[in-house]
Structure formats: structure tokens, C-alpha cells
Amino acid sequence: MNKPFGFIIFFIYLIASQLIAGCTIQPSEQSDIDVLQKHVEWLAHDDRLGRLSGSFGEADAANYISDYFAQTGLEPLGRAGTYLQQFTLTGEISEAMGVMNNRSRNVLGAIRGEEFPERYIVLGAHYDGQGRGGVISMNTEDRDVIHPSADDNASGTAVMMVLAERFAAEPAQVTILFAAFSGEEQGMLGSKHFTEEFLDGSVSAFGMINLDMVGRMTDNEVSIHGTESGNRWSDILSRINTDSLDVQIVSSRLGTSDHVPFHDAGIPAIHYHTGMHDDYHTDRDTAEKLNFSGMVKVADHAEKLIRELAREDPESFQFRQMNRRPNPVIEPGTPTLGVLPDYMFRGNGMRIDEVTSGDRADLAGLQPGDIIKSLNGMTVTNIFDYMNALESISENDSVELQYQRNEQLSTVTISF
């Protein structure tokens, strides 16, 4: 082979190799995917019985996370030199689920900061699930079945565990406190207990990042809620968003997860979330439906955020009180249309993201992208109006629903 021709072939080979490499999963990413899948499959296995707070399945999961923290080298921050912080389950949901006054536990560990060990950033995720569903199930038929709770929230727990390993290998300037909360499904009981008992003045956190439902990424999109809780969140996020993620900043809505008690305690707190889906709070929320490659992207982004936040001066990172709005969650027993709201929509009305086949909205001809403008005589300007309108409907009612499709308004009658 002559040299010029050989050089051309070699050059083409190099270019092709780079193109192929850019389209394949790198070894480090594949390793993270394997670890995430292992954690989720273990946590969401039927042997855990849905990880209901106060149950044997939840205790089993707590021990699993504790063992992982120990193997990873985290400092135990629970009671008596353990990783466990126990608390008692209370409230209406705990009573309805049959675990009233049962003991539950958070799992707490830390990687000390190399420069400012007295400064804390909290990275949290709730590891409890919906157990056998019951009053918190969104199943349309049998509610008394195991709810694997894979996306909600084995996904966030697994990402937190992977990040614990990363920070153990390369600590940040400040201490990172890793908190696996329980009792979230009963009203954020674990995170409330943590903020009341642990953050009691002797320990001060200047920022909190919550990972809840981060396993169903589509179109490289992730939303971050609660950025108005701190004066520097938006600036920090703008500096780190250099990858392919489409980050949706939901600044005006705090959300409803374990970052809320931190906000209420005066700590800037945000929430990573990859979106709602039809399997939410059902027995269909299973491990094989998760986007593990997307979860690696969430982990990468959250790591960048934490390392950037660790460089901030806590004195300049100031808390901002956000307005608390009613939770955009359908109460158990409320009649439903069989639609999934588009939580990213900022226009006037409630835009439909998904329609459940065979349910009321589907039978009435509604489609994804339709914008509900009124329901049961009540104007719908946002998701909160929509929830209130649903709660005004009783069984056997027939109500009118007005919706917009391609700038055209239409009205249908729906029977409940």
C-alpha cells in the first residue's frame, strides 16, 4: 500500500472510531448503569413488599442502604454510632395503612469536607414506597397489591447511593450529608423529623438537594423545582448546565416532597424530577421501565451542582421564602378523568400530557395536548383549579368539560 493512500485510510479510521465512540456507552457510564439497576431491582423487588414505612420491607431496605453506606466509607450520623435515625409514624395515612405508631427510620451518613467540614449540604431521597397501595394507590381496580415503587422512589435512592460513592472517592470542600428518608408517602414524616431533631442548631445546612422520581427521563428532560428558595440557585444552575440535558427550571412551584421541610426550616432546597406518568402510585411502577442511562445523567448533573454549591460562601447564599400553594395531588377517592397533567405547562388552563386508554377522557375523545379550560362549571386556569374542580364532582354526576385544541374550543359531557 502506498503511503498517501495508507494515510488516508488511517485518517478515515480515526474519524470513524471517534464517531462510533461518541455513539456508545462509555465504560464508566455502563458501570454506573449496572450499579443503579442493581440497587433499583433490589429495592423494588417483591421481597420488599413495596417498602411501606413501618413494615419489615422498609426495615430491610434501611439495612441494605446502611450496609452500602458502611462499605462506601460514609461516617454514620444516626443514633449510637449507627446510620439509623428512628421516629414514630403518625397521621391519617399511617393509620389508614395500618402502621400508626410503628417505628420507622431515616438512614444518615456523611462524607466530611476537606476544607470546611463544619459546612453541610444535604442530598436526600426517600426510600419508602407505597407498600400494598391501599388509600394511596392510584390503581383503578385492585388496590391491595404490592406496589414496587421503582420510580417513586427507588430511582432517587439509587442515584443518591451512586453519588455517595463518587463523593467518597473525591470529597467536596464541604461536608455532604446523605439522607435516605422514610415516611414520605405518609406526609414527609422522616424529613420533618430530620429537620426538627438533627438540624437543631448544632448542625447547619446551607443547601438541600432532593431526588424524587428521577427514573423516567424522556427527551433528555429533567425539571428542578424550588429554585426561588435560594438567591443563588439560578446562577449556579446556569453555570453547570453545559451537557445535553434539557433542564426545566420550575422556579415558582415548591413541589411536594422531602425538600419542603427544609424550606420550612429556612434552608434553600430544590427537587430533581423527571416527570409524572400513568404508573405513578400503581403496581405498574416497576424496575424494567426505568431509564437507567437517564438516571446517570441526573447523577452527573446533581454532582456538578453540589460541587459548585460547595464553593459558595454560605453567607451570600440566602434563603427566600416561597409561597405555599395547595398540593397538586388528587386525593384518594376523588373521581378522575384518566389523564396525566403536563406539569411543565405554563399557559392558561391544564394541558393533558397523557390519556389512559379506555378511561373517561379517552371515551370523550380527549387527546394529549388538549388544554382543559373549565370543568363542572369551574374555570380552570392551572393545575390547582383542575384539582379543585375534580374534588367538586360526585359519583354518578354528569358534568361538562370545555377544552382547547389547536385554538378551537369544544365542550363534551363526561359521566362519573
Predicted regions and their residues:
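A non-catalytic alpha/beta surface segment that caps or lines the substrate-entry region
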Residues: R51-I111
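Second-shell loop/turn segments in exported
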Residues: Q26-E29, D46-F56, S94-G98, D142-N153, ...
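His/Asp/Glu-rich mid-to-C-terminal helical/loop segments that flank catalytic regions of hydrolases
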Residues: D278-R324
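Extracytoplasmic/secreted proteins, especially bacterial periplasmic and envelope-associated proteins
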Residues: S31, V35-K38, W42, F56-Q71, ...
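C-terminal recognition in membrane/secretory proteostasis and scaffolding
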Residues: K289, A310-F416
